[in-house]
Amino acid sequence: MSTLNALLDRSAQEGGGKTAIVFGDRETSFLALRQEILEIAEGLRRAGVAKGDRVAIVHRNAPEFIIAYFAINRLGAIAVPINFMVQKADELAYMLGDCGAKGVFTQKDFLPGLNGAAAKCPDLRALWVTDAGAEHTALVRPYSELRAAAFPESSADPAVEGDVAAILYTSGTTGFPKGVMLTHRNLVTNCESALKRMNLTRSDVTLCILPMFHSFAWTGIVLTSLRLTLTSVVFSAIAPAKPWLKAMGRRGVSLFAAVPQVYAALVREAKGWKTRAFLRFWAFRRVKIAVSGAAPLSNVVADGFQQALGLAIDQGWGLTETSPVATISAPDAIRLGMVGPPIEGVRVKIVDDLEASLPIGSEGEICVSGDCVMKGYWNRPEDTRAAFTADGWLKTGDIGVLDEDGYLAIRDRKKDMIIVKGLKVFPAQVEAMIAENPAIEESAIIGVPDELGDEVIKAFVVLKKGAVADKSALLQYFKERLDAYKRPRDVEILDALPKNALQKVLKRELRDRELKKRDVAGN
């Protein structure tokens, strides 16, 4: 099974009439899912989409997201899932123009930005809207018009394993986002290798609350569920949580995947005995695997979750460029603070700044090789070359350390590392300490220049509801618990930290805001 098309065909053959997707009151079987995919694929073919063309998806979680993705791939075309939180016309125009998208599957809420972007995208022919209420134009078309006679069953799979299946745009800290090219082989083998580590069976049920445009949700939940013919309970968003928590118990969800911020929120809510009982004896009553990814998970949250719900969190690691899973533990071999050993077909090594391999126990940049590693960046040959070492390993930009058993621990992002008087400070370590303060809900630290141009640490914190703390008290707390070079010299209390759709803190926005404040002060 080397392509996503083959994976889909097998899921329909093995799953048949079993429910593949639960979305609200709507249930779709594996056979019905494939049938609609074939129909939409034929509609796309009639609309002029061919092998190698790019078609974007700007859409919340829904069956139509999955249908669109596989229909695009069915023609040998390339799916381009885009973060639906990007709604500015200029940003959308850059991505749609960069990949040369011929069309976009979307929802009416996102039309203002897409209509604005369309004027700058000469290749864009149609915006197919999946929900009702949109005003149709020559450009804005109803999804239903693509429902054609099914794609001919006799048609050979136009894709081969080395073909690009998807382009995923990563949000860089500077400049424009880069399009990560993932092949059919990348995605299929990554899904299958991760499954071998997870010990799932066909009776398991998954929950998809993470956005499908992100590789964590797509490979870790959607492809996993299709590959094993698991029923997946899908929600359009993480918030509000109550509907999906109730559905977890009702549907018997056994695989739960979320980001650290969701786990932290659950730990906070579980402090009340009624909520803790609801979570432990209803929502999570059948959960056997709880996976965390996309950002570092603090030991405080991991401990709190295990104490409250009796489940150890299985923290995995990877990035968009690795499809995304590179490491994860078997459910019975989880180690606190570790993200597991590499999955089958993946190798990991630690290197220094000169790309020389470091011995076990040494901190350095994590490099990865194997079937999961991207083909490269779309239309960016120089960036692609720069992403790899001289001997062909992907440089991940993460700092980590391997132990003697091959387990990996993540220290931080290389770009987030702060150098204070020549000493390295990893923000994740400092933020973990700050999290121990009972008044603090969450925090983030960044490096800022002092009056002499040296880098010092500034902390941004959000207080818990009803908690009281001022700047001087927080600075004193830091002084008592941190070495001098790791200590924030300034702290700002915010109502909320800027985050993306995965609830990951956007430190670049904090840096940008700080620079603007300093520019204003300088003038």
Explain the meaning of each model-derived region.
Residues 84, 90-94, 104-106, 249, ...:
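AMP-binding/adenylate-forming catalytic core of the ANL superfamily
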Residues 26, 41-86, 424:
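Conserved AMP-binding/adenylate-forming
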Residues 245, 250-258, 264-335, 347:
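Gly/Ser/Thr-rich phosphate-binding loop
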Residues 7-29:
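AMP-dependent adenylate-forming
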Residues 25, 109-161, 268-273:
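ANL superfamily adenylate-forming
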Residues 29-32, 165-189, 329:
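Conserved AMP-binding A3 loop
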